[in-house]
Amino acid sequence: MKKYLKDYEYKILYKRIIFTCWILLIYIFGTHIPAITTVRTYTAISNFYKMTAANVGGDYQALNVFSLGLGPWLTAMIFMTLFYYRDSDRMMKQTRREKSTKERIFTLILALIQAYFVVFTLLSHVKIDHSEKWLIILVLVTGAMILVWLSDLNMRFGIAGPMPIVMISIIRSIMRQNVALSELGPTLLISAALVLIIILLVLIFIEITEYRLPYLDVMDVSSRREHTYLAWKLNPGGSIAIMISFAAFFVLNSAVNLIVQFFNSKNNGVLNFLDFSTPIGITIFLILQLVLSYGISRLILDPKRKAKDFKKNGDFFPGVEPGKPTYHYLIHKARRISWIGAFIVTIIIGIPLYATLLIPQFSKEIYLSV
């Protein structure tokens, strides 16, 4: 019987791997279908936008069916979750279909905004009619919704949800970058390597660091006096907050440019202040990263649910009364942990981004390392 169950598990795993491979083949095939039949499109989008688009499965090197990637969906999903954060009971009462419908509508709106900005930026110097541009926008939005559907299918029948698509996109982006390490010089290479090692050690420290809150377990009647504690990671959001911040910043950039072009039709260019080549753009992005990282950490820690679990089980913290005092105690601790983790991650990302302003000739290499 045990052998039969083991063989059955391997068979299920095998089917899931095959299904994910088919999803990736469809994604790769879609990236080779151009949305416009030109040899090369002029792009006013910086290299950093191209690389960050790859982090969510997008591609701004040349317009194809899946150029928008999963950015609109990931942004919509996290903002919907943050919107219902204070009313989690209402969110729990919703059916899967209701949640999915609201996410898809929000994703469609964000995809439309992002597609408009991308098309009118990439094709600003290509002589085509406005009707053709709107047709390309329709193709991009349709491709984004198809990619969301494929990711949802892979989440149900495949492995790791949208992550295989993102990984393939990142690999394609890295292979396109022509990074000439020989031009950097030995001093700069050694300095960059030391900085990367220090950042890597800090990231490992953040990953393994836990903030422990000791509590008394009333159900523990064993004679062994083992310490029971509530363990929270310093950065529970991990890389999710960074990925979402890139997608949200690009959507913000798209929305601002769309509003400016709507009220000022003579301005067909791209606003430079929301770009990583300016200190204002980097600062706005880091503020967005700080806020989103804090919000996602609070969302994952979920002190409200923890307080309910403690009240239900009868557990309590030393010196803290059960009920509302426990809830306020957990809120205070979760707020402190979330801010500390968000500040550390923001500083780690901010240092190399501000470094691109001092040495812009190596901005591509720094963007690639980020």
UniProtKB/Swiss-Prot annotation:
GO BP of this protein: intracellular protein transmembrane transport; protein targeting
Topological type in the membrane: Multi-pass membrane protein
Gene3D superfamilies: SecY subunit domain
Entry keyword set: Cell membrane, Membrane, Protein transport, Translocation, Transmembrane, Transmembrane helix, Transport
Record-annotated membrane-spanning stretches: 17-37, 65-85, 105-125, 134-154, 155-175, 188-208, 240-260, 276-296, 339-359
Functional description taken from the UniProt entry: Part of the accessory SecA2/SecY2 system specifically required for export of possible cell wall proteins. The central subunit of a protein translocation channel.
Subunit-structure text: Component of the accessory SecA2/SecY2 protein translocase complex required to export cell wall proteins. May form heterotrimers with SecE and SecG subunits.
NCBIfam families recorded: acc_sec_Y2 (TIGR02920), PRK12417.1 (NF009082)
Protein's recorded name: Accessory Sec system protein translocase subunit SecY2
Record organism: Staphylococcus carnosus (strain TM300)
Name of the gene: secY2
